[in-house]
Structure formats: structure tokens, C-alpha cells
Regions:
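Bacterial N-terminal signal peptides that target proteins for export
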Residues: 2-15
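C-terminal motif of bacterial Sec signal peptides marking the signal peptidase cleavage site
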Residues: 22-25
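Bacterial signal peptide processing site
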Residues: 27-29
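N-terminal active-site segment of His-dependent metallophosphoesterases
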Residues: 36-107, 169, 174, 201-202
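Extended active-site neighborhood of metal-dependent phosphoesterases/phosphodiesterases
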Residues: 48, 87, 100-191, 203-226, ...
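Residue-level marker for buried hydrophobic side chains located in beta-strands
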Residues: 59-61, 92-94, 128-129, 193, ...
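Active-site glycine-centered loops adjacent to acidic/histidine catalytic or metal-binding residues
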Residues: 64, 96-97, 131-132, 196, ...
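A short C-terminal boundary segment appended to hydrolase-like catalytic domains
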Residues: 270-307
């Protein structure tokens, strides 16, 4: 894996965390009320990297977005600018909490249809994992039907990569079996797994013990390229000893959470930022380039992963 760490001075500084020793569980912070920063009228002019040469597929990914408010729209507008600047986007991918506060169908237009209208199309679908705010009130199946998606878990394929969507609201052995079956079958070199509650996190909710025991051993054994999670409203990228990259991308639009500087029990942290953002994923051959883009258009982090 080739890693490029990008630092910014002042308010956009990216904090690189120290290497942390693995242990059984990640220390968590008490539940806190999210804080919403002052929102500028419009994002600043984006400063995107040049599109990856030889790209055969790509997507944008985000989580914890579905408020229907200004910050969500600004993140979506910056995603549209990314798409219009020559970066390939074949799908929009979310790691859950797509419709606040309770996933009600009456909120689908405000939280899903309107914000992403400039990006979504028949050729550029929205593929979602369900978060707790989508599923806990019983509306998860309706959201999947609204987006013409199958029941979870499900798989999607783009050129060069397979995307596997799990329901982390019920991290059970049945899904572990499904995951093992999918990863054991012939397929692209790049396998990307998406679910809501994080395998590893250093913010309010912390790591998810049941996922760590049921799913992480499978992800590690098959050396998946990338795991995309949400639930904690910030950004962090971890890299395990098996060269699996775990990303928390909970900055899609809702209020942000502070990172716990005393966090333990995770793989080494490579980069973190308490910023609203999305991920731009570009695939070329057996490599993917992951670019983390702030709501205001700056590049917060970038890494290339090869399998």
C-alpha cells in the first residue's frame, strides 16, 4: 500500500494519530450531543486532485448525511463538483443513517432525493447500507424498496471491484456466513465492504465488539481492500496488520463528534479529521485511490490501495 498523508495548517489541519497497540475493544467516550459548526453560505472553490489515470470505475461514499439541511446539501454539491471535474463516478454509496431522525418515508424526498438530484441518474444509482436511524423504527425495508435495492445483505459489482453491503444493525452469524461465501467465490481483486456501525472507531460510539468478533476475522482472512463505515460523525482511517484499510466516514451532513485522543484497541490510525466530507474512490486495474474531500473542497487525506 502506498500512503500519502496530507497536512493542512490552521483550521483545516489534518491530525495524524500515533500507532496504537491492539487490544480487545476500543475505549469510547460518553454519548455526546453533536456540534454543528458555523456554515458558510457556499463551499469554497474546490481544489481536487487530477483524476486518476487509467480509471475504469469509481464512486463517492459518505455516511450520516440524511438531515435534509444545509450542510448535507453542501457536501452533496461538492460531490457534484467532483463528478463534473472529470472524476469517474458510477454510483453513490452510503454507510447508513440516510434519513434522520427515524427513517420515515415522509423524509425520503428531503433526505435522499433532493440533496443528490444533481448526481444521481439511472446510470449512477445510490446504493445504501442501513444505519440505526434508518432501521430502528422499522422503515428499513421501505427505504431499500424506494431505492430499488434488495434486502440486506447484498452485493454490487463495478468494473474491477465488488461492493458488499451488510446490515450492522443485526451483526449475526448468518451474515458472517454470507460474507465468507461472497469473499471465497471468484471475483475482482478489489473487495470493498460497507456497513454502518464501525469495526473500529475512536469517537463517541467507538468500535463495535460484536462486529469485531463476527466479521473482522473474515475481512482480515480475505484481506479485503477497504471497509467503509459510519455511525461516528468524523473521519478516521485505520490500517490493520493484514493490510486491510478501515474508514469511518461519518461526515456526510449531521453534527460532528470529537475524537477520543485516549482511544485504544484499534489498528494503527493513519489519518483523522473532524470535518464534514465524502470519499472519492477511483479504481484502475488492481488498485484504488481513496481521496477524502472536505465539504469545502480541500483534500484531507489520500491513499492508494493495491491488491
Amino acid at each position: 500500500v502506498t500512503i500519502k498523508k496530507i497536512l493542512h495548517a490552521g483550521p483545516t489541519r489534518l491530525i495524524l494519530a500515533a500507532v496504537i497497540t491492539l487490544s480487545a475493544a476500543c475505549q469510547t467516550l460518553p454519548v455526546a450531543t453533536p456540534t454543528t459548526p458555523t456554515v458558510p453560505a457556499e463551499p469554497v472553490a474546490p481544489s481536487f486532485p487530477t483524476p486518476l489515470a487509467g480509471t475504469t470505475a469509481g464512486f463517492v461514499a459518505f455516511a450520516d448525511a440524511g438531515t435534509g439541511e444545509a450542510v448535507q446539501q453542501q457536501v452533496a454539491d461538492t460531490m457534484a463538483a467532483w463528478t463534473n471535474s472529470g472524476h469517474r463516478v458510477d454510483a453513490l454509496v452510503t454507510a447508513g443513517d440516510n434519513v434522520y431522525p427515524d427513517g420515515a418515508p415522509s423524509r425520503f424526498a428531503a433526505a435522499i432525493a433532493t440533496p443528490y438530484a444533481a448526481i444521481r441518474s439511472a446510470d449512477r444509482p445510490l446504493w445504501v447500507a442501513l444505519g440505526n436511524h434508518d432501521a430502528d423504527s422499522g422503515y428499513g425495508a421501505e427505504q431499500l424498496a424506494y431505492l430499488s435495492l434488495p434486502a440486506m445483505p447484498y452485493a454490487k459489482t463495478i468494473t474491477g471491484a465488488q461492493l458488499l453491503f451488510l446490515d450492522a444493525n443485526r451483526p449475526d452469524a448468518a451474515q458472517a456466513t454470507w460474507l465468507e461465501t461472497q469473499l471465497s467465490a471468484p471475483g475482482p481483486a478489489l473487495r470493498i465492504v460497507i456497513f454502518h456501525q464501525p469495526a473500529y472507531s475512536c469517537a463517541t460510539h467507538g468500535s463495535t465488539a460484536l462486529i469485531d468478533s463476527l466479521w473482522v476475522p473474515i475481512l482480515e482472512a480475505h484481506r479485503v481492500a477497504l471497509v467503509i463505515n459510519g455511525h461516528d460523525h468524523y473521519y478516521e482511517r485505520f490500517r490493520s496488520s493484514s493490510d486491510v484499510t478501515y474508514v469511518v466516514t461519518g461526515g456526510g451532513g449531521n453534527g460532528l463528534y470529537a475524537r477520543n485522543p485516549s482511544c485504544t484497541g484499534t489498528p494503527p490510525s493513519q489519518a483523522t479529521a473532524t470535518r464534514h466530507h465524502f470519499l472519492g474512490v477511483e479504481i484502475a486495474g488492481s488498485s484504488l485511490r481513496l481521496t477524502t474531500v472536505a465539504r469545502t473542497g480541500e483534500t484531507l487525506d489520500q491513499v492508494t490501495i493495491t491488491r
